[in-house]
Regions:
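Cell-envelope/extracellular polymer assembly enzymes that use nucleotide-activated donors
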Residues: 5-7, 165
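Acidic helix N-cap motif at the loop->helix transition within catalytic regions
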Residues: 17-21, 41-50
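Conserved donor nucleotide-binding strand/loop of the catalytic core
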Residues: 44-77
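Conserved catalytic loops of nucleotide-sugar-dependent glycosyltransferases that act on lipid-linked
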Residues: 66-67, 117-219
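Short beta-strand-to-loop acidic/aromatic patch adjacent to the donor-nucleotide binding site
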Residues: 79-90
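Conserved donor NDP-sugar-binding/catalytic core segment of glycosyltransferases
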Residues: 97-119
């Protein structure tokens, strides 16, 4: 069997409880690339027992940097499509089928749409982006990209925008974006957003930056 044209990028930091199951769960959809962000709980060692490609940071660089590392690797290694998902097991991965479908049909960017969100600030962000741009869940960890969209901008997320910066630029430039429903379950382990107060501050900052980029489409 030849190499897949789909790379599935999974950022992981201290996800030993779920990483093996997640890696095995998604490998039927494409080649799995796991970016270990200097975990200390054995995540890396568990990844080495799977068929996934392991990319490792030498220090803890954060969620956005992990996604950027994986996506850059996928593009440099000539994968046509890149799908991101989280390592915590929260996202039910049969939702990847919808992402793959839209990518294969020619969509440049596909955004997952979760059936529930954990925080009111996430609900607010989604409400605002839906009202203005008809995108309901910009913070969903499952997204799909044609590699050409990365090449167009040359970066993924340089502003620590929880993986939404490339989406914001795509909205600004009227890139065709498709949403697909994703089912979630209660996550295991610590949230990528941190505690309730820190997540409120972090997401509020992202909302400000996101609209600062994307809303230029409306005022140009």
């Amino acid at each position: 069997m030849g190499r897949s044209d789909i790379a599935i990028v999974i950022p992981a930091f201290n996800e030993a409880e779920t990483i093996y199951e997640v890696a095995c769960d998604v490998e039927k959809y494409g080649d799995v690339l796991i970016v270990d962000d200097y975990s200390t709980d054995g995540t890396r060692e568990l990844v080495e027992t799977t068929r996934a490609t392991l990319l490792s940071h030498k220090s803890n660089l954060g969620y956005e940097a992990s996604l950027s590392t994986g996506i850059k690797y996928a593009v440099e290694n000539d994968y046509r499509y890149i799908i991101t998902t989280d390592a915590d097991g929260e996202l039910i991965h049969f939702g990847i089928e919808g992402v793959v479908k839209f990518l294969k049909e020619g969509c440049l960017l596909v955004v997952g749409k979760r059936n529930k969100k954990n925080r009111m600030i996430e609900v607010l962000f989604g409400f605002l982006t839906f009202c203005v741009f008809r995108i309901q869940d910009p913070l969903c960890g499952m997204k799909g990209y044609n590699a050409d969209i990365y090449r167009k901008y040359g970066f993924f997320d340089n502003r620590k925008m929880i993986g939404t910066e490339l989406l914001a630029y795509s909205i600004r430039d009227n890139v065709a974006i498709q949403e697909t429903p994703i089912t979630v379950i209660k996550r295991k382990g610590e949230s990528r957003f941190g505690g309730s107060f820190s997540s409120f501050i972090k997401i509020s900052r992202v909302i400000f930056l996101f609209f600062g980029i994307a809303f230029k489409r409306k005022t140009a």
